[in-house]
Amino acid sequence: MHGRLKVKTSEEQAEAKRLEREQKLKLYQSATQAVFQKRQAGELDESVLELTSQILGANPDFATLWNCRREVLQQLETQKSPEELAALVKAELGFLESCLRVNPKSYGTWHHRCWLLGRLPEPNWTRELELCARFLEVDERNFHCWDYRRFVATQAAVPPAEELAFTDSLITRNFSNYSSWHYRSCLLPQLHPQPDSGPQGRLPEDVLLKELELVQNAFFTDPNDQSAWFYHRWLLGRADPQDALRCLHVSREEACLTVSFSRPLLVGSRTEILLLMVDDSPLIVEWRTPDGRNRPSHVWLCDLPAASLNDQLPQHTFRVIWTAGDVQKECVLLKGRQEGWCRDSTTDEQLFRCELSVEKSTVLQSELESCKELQELEPENKWCLLTIILLMRALDPLLYEKETLRYFQTLKAVDPMRAAYLDDLRSKFLLENSVLKMEYAEVRVLHLAHKDLTVLCHLEQLLLVTHLDLSHNRLRTLPPALAALRCLEVLQASDNAIESLDGVTNLPRLQELLLCNNRLQRPAVLQPLASCPRLVLLNLQGNPLCQAVGILEQLAELPPSVNSILT
C-alpha cells in the first residue's frame, strides 16, 4: 500500500469537521467580542470595519454589526479627505456586493446599501440598476432586490416606461414572476393616470386589453402558476363603494334612530361626524353601535328625546348629515305611525358588484369565455375555476347563480384543502343574491333556509327585516353583527350547529327565537337573551342543554314573558 494516500474514515472526517467548526466559532466569538468592546470604548475606527468585515462576510444577517459599521462611517466622514472618503465608499460598496453573493436576500445588506447611497452627493444610479439586473437574473423573485430597485428607480427618476420595459423582459423570460407582475400594477397607473372623474388606478381600455392578452399568454402557458392569476384579478379590478347612507330608520316606540352606511365608520372621530336635524333644528345626540362596542361599524344609532316624537304634530322630519361622505338622508315619521324609514332602491351593481369589477361588461364577458376555454383544457385548475366564478358574479350574480353553484362544487372537489374557505365564499354570494331578491321584491322577510350556509355576512343590509329564516344550514354561531337587525321580530335558526348565542343581543323587537336541534351545551349560553326585552317564545328542543343541570335557574333569569320550550 506504499505510495497511496491514506483515505480518512467517516469518523475521522466527522471529527475533522467538528474541530473546524469549533475553530470558526472561536474566531467568530472573539471578533464579535472585540467589536463590542471597541464600540463600548468609543473606538470607532477602521479596525472596527475590518473586524466586522470578517464576521459579516460569512454571516451578513448580523444586524447589530451593520449598525456598528454605520457609526464608524459617520465618524470617518468628519475625519477623511474627499479623496479618502471616496475610496472608502468604493471599498464599502464592493464589500456589500460580496455579502450579497453570500446571501442575496440579506435584509441588513440591502438596507445598508440604501443608507450608503443616500449619503453620497452624486451616487452612480446606473451602476445600481445594473447590479439589480444581475441579481434578478439569478433569482427574479428576490423581493429584497426588487425593493432596492424601486428605491433606485425613484432616486434616479427613471421614467416608468423604462421600468415597465424592464418587467417586460423578465416576464417574457419567465411568466412565473410575481414581483414583475406586481411592479407592473404599480407602474401602469403612473403611465396612464385617469382623470379626476374616473376610477382611480384603472386603465384605459386599449391598455387593459393589451395587458389581458399578455396575462392570458401567461396562464395558458402555465395555468397552475398563481402570479399571473393574481395580476389578472388586479386588471379586472374592484371599485371602492361610494360613500352613502344606505338606510335611515326611526322608531317611536323605542325612541331610537338608526342609520346604516356603505362602509364601516367610527362616529365621533375627527373625520367621521354625524349631524342630526329634527324638523330642521339641530339635535345633539350620543351615537353608539348596536352591540355597544366603540369600534368601526356599518350601523349606528341614537336615542331620541320625547319632544322629537310628539304624536300631536302631523309629522316629524329627521335628517342625518354625514360630513365626511358629504351625503345626507331624510325620513318622515307620520302621526299615528310607530316607525318611519327611508331606504334608496339600490341595484346589485351598487350593493355588491362594485367589490368585484369596474370594467365594462364586454371585457368581462370576453374574459369569461377565455377562462371557460382554458377550463375545458385544464378541468381541474383551481385558479381558472375561481376566476370563472368571480367573473360571473361581476357580470350578473342572479343570472349565473345556478351555474356558479355548480362551479363551486367542482372547485371544492379540485381543492379540498380550501373547502371551508370556499363554503364561506359560497355562503357570502348566496346571501348577497337573497338580499338582492328581497330588495327587488320590496319585502321585509328573508328566507335563507336550506342553503347550506356556513357564515353570515352583509347583516347591515338587513336593518328593516322583521322575519329571518336561517333554518337547516351549517351555521355554528350567530355573529355580533346580528344586533344590526333592529326591526327583527322572528328569528328561525333551527337545525344548524349553533354553539353560542353571543350575537343575539340587544334586539329590541325580537319576540320569537327558534333554536331546535342545535349544539347548545351549557345553560350559560342563554345569558345574552336577557337583553332582548320582548322575547316571548324560545324553542330549545333537541339541544344538549335541555338535559343540563341548572337550565331552569338560567331560564328564570330571562324576562318573565318568555315561554320556553325544552322538550
UniProtKB/Swiss-Prot annotation:
Gene coding for it = RABGGTA
User: Its function?
Assistant: Catalyzes the transfer of a geranylgeranyl moiety from geranylgeranyl diphosphate to both cysteines of Rab proteins with the C-terminal sequence -XXCC, -XCXC and -CCXX, such as RAB1A, RAB3A, RAB5A and RAB7A.
Q: What class of enzyme is it?
A: transferase
Note whether Phosphoprotein occurs among the keywords.
yes
- What binding partners and quaternary form does the record give? Heterotrimer composed of RABGGTA, RABGGTB and CHM; within this trimer, RABGGTA and RABGGTB form the catalytic component B, while CHM (component A) mediates peptide substrate binding. The Rab GGTase dimer (RGGT) interacts with CHM (component A) prior to Rab protein binding; the association is stabilized by geranylgeranyl pyrophosphate (GGpp). The CHM:RGGT:Rab complex is destabilized by GGpp. Interacts with non-phosphorylated form of RAB8A; phosphorylation of RAB8A at 'Thr-72' disrupts this interaction.
Q: Which family does it belong to?
A: Belongs to the protein prenyltransferase subunit alpha family.
Annotated LRR repeat ranges: 442-463, 464-486, 487-508, 509-530, 534-555
Protein activity control? The enzymatic reaction requires the aid of a Rab escort protein (also called component A), such as CHM.
Swiss-Prot/TrEMBL GO biological process terms: protein geranylgeranylation
Q: Which GO terms describe its molecular function?
A: Rab geranylgeranyltransferase activity; small GTPase binding; zinc ion binding
In Swiss-Prot or TrEMBL terms, this protein is called: Geranylgeranyl transferase type-2 subunit alpha
The EC number of this protein is 2.5.1.60
Keywords, comma-separated and alphabetical: Leucine-rich repeat, Phosphoprotein, Prenyltransferase, Repeat, Transferase
Q: Determine if Phosphoprotein is one of this entry's keywords.
A: yes
Which positions carry Phosphoserine? 98
Per-repeat ranges for PFTA: 44-78, 88-122, 124-158, 159-193, 207-241, 363-397
